[in-house]
């Protein structure tokens, strides 16, 4: 089941950002393989392209993925939070 959602996530990101302006990765319970209630999607990129992240939220809201996709702008995230995620969480890079 996880791989099916992963394929959908990759497809949605490719459609949303065909120029590959940002880097995308998954973290949190989805990646750890725990029973999850949401999917955490981290985004790193340039400021101009990050301004459209609310549009990306809409893309996932309208998708058939049965979990809420929380989009986290890692360029604007707290330093301690980024440290925790990058040092202690398993990451699954989308691109």
Language-model features, listed with the residues they occupy:
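Catalytic core of pol beta-like nucleotidyltransferases
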Residues: 1-26, 31-37, 44-95
